[in-house]
């Protein structure tokens, strides 16, 4: 990335930064400070059949077929109103992660979303940190914002832990 952004928000999911820091992002945007929101877990679901748990979440979110595309469009519109740029990484939300050689999904219930991080996700913060360092080289003048993990969601905890690497 060639542009300089003095304020970079790490948003675990689409809408997290907007909902938690929207006021500050807007202040920075109208002041011409060019905030950037990087959404880490904004990837599309896998092509294979979705679990019953994921299907129930998609139905609750109101668009069982195109939920990620709909959420991306909503997030993009909200960030435009706030005056922020955005970048999306293609890591999937925890509800889609897993399968691999065992066929196991890592997070298959509401309780699991707020429980322990699956052992297979243990290396994810380091991988994300490497990706982010390539996108935004460390340097003076950049303030990085990360979630406080209120609520204890797995993806929020993974996002916070990557800044301690």
Regions found by a protein language model. Give the residues of each.
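Active-site rim/loop-helix segments in enzyme catalytic domains that contact anionic ligands
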Residues: 1-121, 125, 129-139
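Short, well-ordered beta-to-alpha junction loops that form the rim of enzyme active sites
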Residues: 12, 89-92, 146-156
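Active-site histidine-anchored catalytic micro-motif
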Residues: 18-27, 147, 153-156, 160-161
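Conserved small/polar residues in nucleotide/adenosyl-binding loops
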Residues: 164-165
């Amino acid at each position: 990335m060639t542009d300089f952004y003095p304020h970079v928000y790490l948003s675990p999911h689409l809408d997290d930064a907007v909902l938690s820091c929207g006021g500050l992002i807007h202040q920075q945007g109208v002041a011409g400070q060019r905030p950037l929101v990087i959404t880490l877990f904004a990837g599309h679901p896998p092509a294979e059949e979705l679990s019953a748990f994921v299907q129930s979440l998609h139905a609750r979110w109101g668009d069982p077929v195109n939920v990620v595309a709909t959420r991306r469009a909503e997030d993009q519109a909200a960030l435009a109103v706030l005056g922020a740029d955005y970048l999306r990484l293609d890591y999937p939300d925890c509800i889609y992660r897993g399968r691999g050689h065992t066929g196991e999904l890592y997070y298959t219930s509401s309780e699991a979303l707020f429980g322990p991080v699956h052992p297979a996700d243990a290396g994810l913060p380091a991988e994300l940190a490497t990706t982010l360092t390539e996108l935004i080289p460390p340097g003076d003048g950049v303030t990085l914002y990360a979630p406080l993990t209120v609520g204890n969601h797995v993806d929020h905890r993974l996002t916070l832990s990557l800044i301690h690497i």
